[in-house]
Amino acid sequence: MQEVDDVAHAVVNGFGVAGLAIGVVKGEQVYTKGFGVKSIETQEPVTANSLFHLASISKTFVASAVVQLAEQGKLELDAPILTYLPDFILDDERYRQITVRQMLSHTAGMPDTDDYCWDRPEYDDQALERYVRSLAHEKLIAAPGEKFAYSNIGYEVLGLLIARTSGQSFEDYIEQHLLRPLGMNSSTFLKMDVAPEHATTPHILLPPTVVSPEYPYNRAHAPSSTLHSSASELCSWILMNLNRGELQGRRVLQTTSFEQLWHPYQQTGPSHPDEFVGLSWFIDTYRGQRRIRHDGVDTGFQSDMVILPDHSIAVVALANTIPAPMNMIMNAIVDLLLGLEPSIPKPPVLMSMGTILSAHGIQEAVDRYRHLQETGADQYDFDPEQFLDIGYTLLEVRRYDECFRTAQLGLELFPDAPEIADLLKQLKSRVGKA
């Protein structure tokens, strides 16, 4: 798999990504490898067994657990959530209509959150239940079943649903009924159970790449976000999905349950006309092939998982740096598996300008950009989208000064780009910086 290694090395060397782990499945063949480092401070190498925070890929485990409980007769997917969580309350009478299936498919009309309190995490057993109780003041943003609206909040409610209907904590149920039966013995939703020798550190690309002062963990948001796993163990998860519920003779889901999990329930929006949401999973096409996918991003970590079930191929990529070019990575490796010529990602031009921008200011960075346009057109990616990718990342992790400089530079280079102007407006509304 030298070509896979070439893609990974290009990302680590050219995109400021501290560490990256790749898992590839083709039929029953599995290839896993780590690249880069777990932390730029320790320089310990990433391996296929290094544990990464997965962010929203966690939701695919939640959905499988809920469907598993439905198989056991402990809940019905089309029953109202209130049937199993009678104390669940929103400040909107329509919430009484929300079904389990609607919550799983992000069609419940639930709002979302942009504050996970990573800087003030809760670790106790009651954290999830307290969070769900705190939603009593929230209102729906649409009628249940009306449209797709991605909601992390909805998956916290589903986590409590798993706990109530199983009689176990959310984390214990997932561990005993999904992770351990699949041999995913190092994987865990509990940060305190992450083996230190396998742990990875979150990083942020300013540029340059720095260690994040926050770690994305809060037990109140475990179901939506906090599974830790490795490329090696996630390949077991992928194989179970490709085999429709079975791994090495151990069945954790009925074959027919994948008709529910991968059913295209609702189009996600007009900007993605061929993308639909299933039960947690997203369904679209790539190169004319059906693709099942989920990705994730939180402070310092980014992940992506792609399954092409009709070809029995899949890829997972885990990075301990944001932003990371996950689409480029996944598309290049999937192309390889399909027998196509991959496009090796070019590093963003911002990578060669970040320290100039912070140390010497806008004008020198502009001059550097113009020079590279003339001399390095084949070496760098000059897409203005990179200013948005890095800018919004910096905004979300509250690195406002760096965000401001990045947006200013982008606007200087692309004065007619309304998206960059919008980034500056959002920054101004956040902190009053003009």
Q: What do the predicted segments below correspond to?
A:
Residues 1-33, 118, 122-123, 163-176, ...:
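Catalytic loop of the DD-peptidase/beta-lactamase superfamily, centered on the K-T-G motif
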Residues 14-15, 26, 37-152, 168, ...:
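Active-site-proximal loop and beta-strand segments within enzyme catalytic domains
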